[in-house]
Amino acid sequence: HLVQCDIETVPMTTAPATSLFIQDEQFKGRIPDDPRFNKVDYEGADVQEPEPGRYTNMAIMDIKAMYHSNVKLHNICWTTLSEDGKDCGNGSKFDQDKSGLLGRVMDKMTVKRNEYKALMKQATTDADKRKWDAMQFATKSMVASLYGVSGDSKYGMYHPDIAAAITYTSRQTLFRLRDECNDRGYPVRYGHTDSIFCEVPSPEEGMQLVAKINESMAPIETEFEKWCESMILKAKNRYAGKVTWTDGGYHDPEYYYKGLELKQARMPKAMKSAMDGTLRGILDGKDREDIDDYLIGLINDGNTGKLGESLLMKGRLRRPLHKYKSISGAVAGVVWAKEHLDKRYQVDDTFLTAIGAGGQYYAFD
């Protein structure tokens, strides 16, 4: 519905983009059937290596629609690429006297998204709210994918200079946001793609800070999304936070995890409970003895049989056994079940699995 293509086309990623491009009234060109350039590696988004530790009073700030913003700011597009244009900073030059196809289509999708978000707020039933939420998310995803098609080496609109220009200008935008915070006395502890985590004493001070940053970096806009009373930084894309303020308002603590094992569905509930309790304890500022006591209690419950099935993992057979190059983990449990229980799991079957004292995996229903 959004891009006016049939349902079979939607999963193909680049085809919906083609549909949007050819609907643009100002675009009079053609979409090549095959890419015109050989694949070239280019630098992607920046991810700062954090210093592991526990931090307090951490503000999470995002650059609003960063790729879209930089496409518009520098007029990055296939249709504006010109030796006589303005250098975006990495040597690629773009004509500033006419609007580019990429920016126009991104603008169209953003206008649509704002319409859907307004309809979602006006909705009076859960069904309507879900419908408009799905539509606004679809437009957001479509805008993000429009950058991606320029870097897809199998697509007719592939152009390494376009993709590299977008990622270069976006990295520079993130670096500038980082410098703005550091120079104003708010240390940045982590940064990823379009967001930074910096130490700010209070949400109120964070609001004042982001207002000054937006004045300095206009037309690029930064949003103050969350404020964490405490945060654990472990590594790139691996962190946990105790969020107590979101989008302008205080609320009860919410524990937010990114890239940590307890998010994996296959992990045993008991292991998730242990990790969740440990992380919450650290975020809440509890003493190590208190956290150790909690974990000792879990271990004792496991040894006495109180945890039951929460000690078990979930497994799924992804392909026939003969197609696995090596048999290990949960798949080894499937082999054990076949040999000892005469249980023959089929592709996509799910099962419970456990590990014996000797490292042997067992699978059963």
Where are these regions (language model features)?
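DNA-dependent DNA polymerase catalytic subunits
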Residues: H1-E83, T124-A127, K131, M135, ...
